[in-house]
């Protein structure tokens, strides 16, 4: 049985969120089916999710949660070495609605179950209701037998944070200070929540992300830790690129930043796509009241930064862009001891995210 921990915080109990580059037990995913978000009833997205799951499964266990309606389909489309469990959700972004796993120095494993409101609630959320998504973290903890801390009155998505495992959190003001998350809390109060629930000592606040309309600028499209004292940051020199200013500003900030250990960060540049990724086939996405309508030509957020680090590898999104190969080379230079595994994920970008957004790693414990 997985219990709820009440009255203490992870930091008080000696728990911390480990870095993504630390050893992992496995990865969790959800199965897409939402026809008002995914093209053609979600079938192209399902094929892409399956390719991502198979790529990860070469290196560690993958568990995919599927609705009762889609369980048989998901089971049939995924190889036997990938576990499929029945798990209802409103959509398939487990990074954001799933648990943030924590470890301690004695081999313990716990998780944070953040409140989830579909990226902005009634202010600028992407759909309503979101109650099934808000239950995903607890259900995963039940399946995994992991005790959890619930932040009932604090909204946060996993894609809005990165940690180095040594006391430093990376996030954006655009997202965490947005009116749809925690409008009753000051920046200082939000920072304290991050430090207390991630077991950290310092927050690095990048001002803006590159996705103001959907996630309000998640950090996992902009920058991430690749090793202690080292970060990757998006980079663009073309002043006409839609994300030029955000990339330049993030790079300047990180180049002058120090982490919780006092180290000046080493910043690796990671290119953006040469051309913006524009939505196609919007007429195959259902128009439903209460959701944001989709139109051909919309800029989809296609960031190579939205990769996933797993044991011995990096699963890297590819978009059919001129810079795909360059991104793979740059990531290989950042991770010389890991295999870079490219997966074509343009279909996920059309839905509003990418590989990091559709996965949630569970750390390995002793």
Segments from the language model and where they lie:
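Histidine/cysteine-enriched polar flanking segments
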Residues: 1-366
